[in-house]
Amino acid sequence: FEIIEIGAVKLDENLKEIDRFSRTIRPKVYKKLHYITRDLTGITQEELCASDPFSYVLVDFMLWCGKDYIFCTWGNMDLVELQRNMKYYGLLDLLKGPVKYYNVQKFFRLLCAHDASAVSLESAVDYFQLPKEAGFHRAVNDAAYTADVFRRIDQEEAKKLYSIDYYQNPQNKGDEINLRYDSYYK
């Protein structure tokens, strides 16, 4: 549940990287870093203890995003977890939902791998033979790899497959969003 790091890469309209955001977060609920998380990410307990709390980092992140943005994620859970944490800290009003986003994992599965099963980010990086210059499982590194994969996917086709995160459900019938894709409707 508890987010301990936010990392993102900002792309311009030509998909050129123009900025990065990377911050660790001092945990409030699970104050002791689990050894598996430590081993997977390389984040240390000392680093987390010296970090700002979620509310500070989130406000900085949303300011960094600006007004005109769309999230690109690897999978469909990043926005759910972000909003769960925002709700816990009373900050959900900073992100109006339902949220439109690009699920790059879905794009890769449908447009490149032609497979219905989930695929790891590292597998997609390998598929495109991208250089592995940084470790996986750090937020900003994974964001950079996701952006690299996104750049190599047919943008016109991908943008037809955008996703809507429904963590925040429409409040009335007029706010409902209905999507029709080539192979399904929601």
Question: Predicted segment positions?
Answer:
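Conserved non-catalytic scaffold segment of RNase H-like nuclease domains
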Residues: 1-84, 126
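A short, structured active-site edge motif that brings together acidic residues
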Residues: 24, 96-111
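Active-site-proximal helix-loop-helix substrate-binding element of RNase H-like nuclease domains
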Residues: 32-34, 38-41, 45-48, 107-141
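Short helix-to-loop capping/linker segments positioned immediately adjacent to catalytic or ligand/cofactor-binding
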Residues: 69-73, 92, 132-137
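Substrate-recognition/cap helix-loop segment adjacent to the acidic, metal-dependent catalytic center
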Residues: 77-100
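Active-site catalytic microenvironments for nucleophilic, acid-base chemistry
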Residues: 85-89, 127, 152-156
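Alpha-helical transmembrane segments that form the membrane-embedded catalytic/substrate-binding core
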Residues: 139-149
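Acidic two-metal-ion nuclease catalytic site recognized across multiple nuclease folds
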Residues: 147-186
